[in-house]
Amino acid sequence: WTRTGNYLFTSEAVDQGYIVLGTETLIVNPQHLGTDGYSSTSILSMNDNGQGLLGIDGIFNGVDMDAGTCGPPASNITCNKTPMFKITDNYGQSWAGDHSAYDFYYVPDEVFEDIFSTWPNTDVDACTGEVSVINDFWSWYEFDMRVDQEGNPHIVISLIAESDNYFHFLDGYTGFYHFTI
């Protein structure tokens, strides 16, 4: 397999014990993502009622993590790394999302800003006394997304405080956060 992107395959039939797969669907187009390597691979969750979620923890096209820049189209969506997902109510025969965000729903900046506003503005290194100004956050690649029996999404991601030079682990603030609707 030499192509990039995330593909969805569905089983069409079983023939003499072999699963016959239908035509592949490019479900996460790499052209819709920012700098390669900063978005996770996709995760899929489906309940018994055919309600499902397919998602990644990633950045939108226009974010260049290496250069530290954010331009369109990401600057019109979000420049942050964020959970991005599509939902289905028919076992993945069709998927829905925000059309203005490459058919992904995503956790908006306002949610992260609300969390960030409760964090301390600085962190003092206990060994050196160096004071770092906390000015951003980061999300590692450890995450999970699931749908419950009512079809509601549940997203768990890591949030780490960031300064100009370091990542900071702040007791009682940084760690795993659970988002749901």
Provide a role label for each language-model segment.
Residues 1-181:
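Extracellular, repeat-based ectodomains that mediate carbohydrate processing or recognition
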